[in-house]
Design a protein with these regions (language model features):
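A short C-terminal boundary segment appended to hydrolase-like catalytic domains
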Residues: 258-259, 503-558
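Beta-sandwich/jellyroll recognition modules and their flexible linkers
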Residues: 38-256
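Active-site neighborhood of phospho(di)ester-bond hydrolases with catalytic His/Asp-centered motifs
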Residues: 267-269, 295-300, 328-334, 413-415, ...
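Extended active-site neighborhood of metal-dependent phosphoesterases/phosphodiesterases
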Residues: 307-407, 436-441, 446-447, 460-520, ...
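Active-site-proximal beta-strand elements of phosphoester/diester hydrolases
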Residues: 262-272, 371-381, 412-416, 481-488, ...
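Short acidic, glycine-rich surface-loop motifs adjacent to enzyme active sites
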Residues: 404-424
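N-terminal active-site segment of His-dependent metallophosphoesterases
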Residues: 253-310
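Secretory targeting and sorting signals
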Residues: 1-34
Length: 558
């Protein structure tokens, strides 16, 4: 395999970065800000007016009362709302049904799922205590009323002097015919204005992947002179319909329009020996971000790791030399080591492509929006598990995150496998076993709200609610960290099954998808793009469109 000119350039960039960090004394010992020293950053976020995650109720959860699917003595529910919040049930719900689910209840994901799974467990972004309205489980008791109606109301939130606010909340909604979920706002005791509506006209009943394990971000205009706002979550359904769960509610000041030009990256993963689609994806990315400052390749670049496969990819990269950004940053995936040859041989082929001497490293993208740090993680030894990691790599990540947090910079982290309970598919339990240090890495990232983890491997649809997830952790920063599914250049997968214990993953179709990432001083904007498939070298199509986008504010920006 002949290294391309761009490969040589990225090797030089990595060496220059390492040299500059050594000179600054920042490799091996992260710079510590006042009172931080690499410890979890739990500073408040200036633009957040109100935050409610229901976790203050954790010590008040009651033992199982009536639910027939939960073992006696297991604790995990209460009807007592957080201070200032309230629940109002319809008049017909006072008697009958299962006590635990009489209107909006405050519970945990595990307790709720113990009642019955039926996709409840997929609410993986939930942190500790959540709010749940469940007409299905309520109907498992005698004398269940014909209708289910319940409203969760926020405490009055100060909005005086503001023209607009932004409401965000995590949401897990499964619809049914006749069922409705609504979010409204009322100012100073006035009439309610509808902000969000889920019903049979707006939701695919029984299963709508866009609304499971999702988040809602809703702009809200504030009338002149208004002082306080109350938000309400209304849920109505016939008996024995489905459910709605909510967590991590926040009301914040909207971001101002972005200022200046960004530093930009292309992101691709899971090419797996499809050089034609890779070449087409690079051309489509160049069409929409011709001045990109980096290409991030998030693993599974080849199908099994043979020399011929690497040569095919290198041929595509060489043919795209005039298009490629100056920096190409690669992470190792599981498909880089499937030929049956020794791990060291397969690893070294990847490292030859990546033009560095270890699987993990640090890069700086340099563009109009300034310098953007990129941290690369990866498998260091033969599996199992899928991602064995040395303590040196974990501690290096800890130090580098602390270093960039101290400078209030958003940092891009790329690693092929998702962490458990983050993006699409990772709610399936075996994804929590991919990393040797899954829980430690999750807690570590949760202390750094400026960190954004880009992961591939799952091939799941961008259309799902958990394509991009703000994942919070116990004891971490209240904003948690973001993680984004990179899609795939080769085939799409999805999950099938009602319960996690019997879940199946299947291939659904051929795809060609990736991301663009625009980094500004105070935010990162990620666009999930569809390039369409091709079946011959140098062939193109008319598909090059945005499927989803997410704007990730930098909570540490001044």
């Amino acid at each position: 395999m002949t290294p391309t000119r761009r490969a040589s350039a990225r090797r030089t960039a990595a060496l220059l970065l390492t040299t500059s960090l050594l000179a600054a004394g920042t490799v091996g010992a992260a710079a510590a800000g006042p009172g931080r020293s690499g410890q979890p950053d739990t500073r408040g976020t200036d633009d957040v007016l109100h935050r409610e995650g229901f976790d203050s109720l954790a010590d008040d959860l009651l033992p199982r009362s009536e639910d027939p699917g939960i073992e006696p003595g297991v604790s995990g529910w209460t009807h007592e709302a957080p201070q200032g919040w309230s629940v109002e049930n319809g008049p017909g719900m006072a008697d009958g049904g299962v006590e635990e689910w009489r209107g909006w209840s405050f519970t945990t994901r595990d307790f709720w799922t113990d009642a019955e799974d039926q996709m409840r467990y997929r609410f993986a972004r939930a942190q500790d205590v959540i709010a749940v309205a469940d007409s299905d489980e309520f109907a498992d008791g005698p004398g269940t009323p014909d209708a289910y109606a319940t409203t969760l109301a926020s405490t009055p939130i100060k909005v005086k002097g503001r023209d607009a606010v932004e409401l965000t909340f995590d949401s897990h909604y499964r619809g049914w015919a006749g069922q409705t979920g609504r979010v409204t706002v009322a100012f100073d005791g006035g009439a309610e204005t509808e902000l969000v509506r889920y019903d049979s006209d707006t939701v695919t009943d029984d299963y709508d992947g866009a609304l499971l394990n999702a988040t809602e971000t809703v702009p809200v205009d504030v009338p002149h002179g208004a002082k306080r706002a109350v938000f309400r979550w209304h849920f109505t359904a016939d008996a024995n319909s489905w459910y709605w769960a909510v967590d991590s509610v926040s009301v914040r000041t909207p971001l101002a329009p972005a200022d200046g030009d960004p530093t930009t990256a292309w992101v691709l993963s899971d090419i797996q020996g499809d050089p034609d689609d890779l070449g087409h994806a690079l051309r489509d990315l160049d069409a929409v971000r011709p001045d990109a400052d980096g290409l991030l390749m998030v693993g599974d670049i080849v199908a099994s790791g043979s020399p011929d496969q690497w040569q095919e990819v290198d041929d595509v990269m060489t043919g795209a030399t005039d298009l490629l950004p100056e920096q190409v940053v690669a992470a190792i995936g599981n498909h880089e080591s499937y030929t049956g040859e020794p791990w060291e041989t397969l690893r070294d082929r990847f490292l030859d492509f990546a033009q560095r001497d270890r699987v993990w490293d640090e890069y700086l993208l340099e563009g109009s929006g300034g310098e953007v740090p990129v941290l690369v993680l990866g498998q260091e030894e033969a599996r199992p598990p899928e991602v064995p990691m040395s303590r040196e790599q974990v501690e290096w990540l800890r130090e580098r995150l602390a270093y960039w947090s101290d400078r209030d910079k958003q940092v891009l982290v790329i690693s092929h496998f998702p962490l458990g309970d983050t993006v699409s598919a990772s709610w399936i339990p075996w994804y929590s076993d991919s990393y040797q240090y899954n829980d430690e890495l999750t807690e570590l990232l949760g202390a750094h709200p400026n960190a954004i983890l880009f992961s591939g491997h799952t091939h799941y649809p961008f259309e799902l609610g958990d394509w991009a997830v703000q994942r919070r952790t116990a004891g971490g920063h209240p904003d948690g960290f973001w993680t984004v599914n990179t899609g795939a250049v080769q085939v799409e997968w999805d999950a099938r099954g009602e319960s996690t214990s019997g879940i199946r993953e299947i291939v659904t179709r051929d795809i060609n998808r990736g991301l663009t990432v625009d980094v500004f001083d105070d935010r990162v904007v990620v666009e999930a793009r569809d390039f369409g498939t091709v079946d011959a070298p140098a062939s193109d199509n008319d598909v090059n469109e945005v499927v989803r986008s997410v704007t990730i504010p930098n909570p540490l920006a001044e």
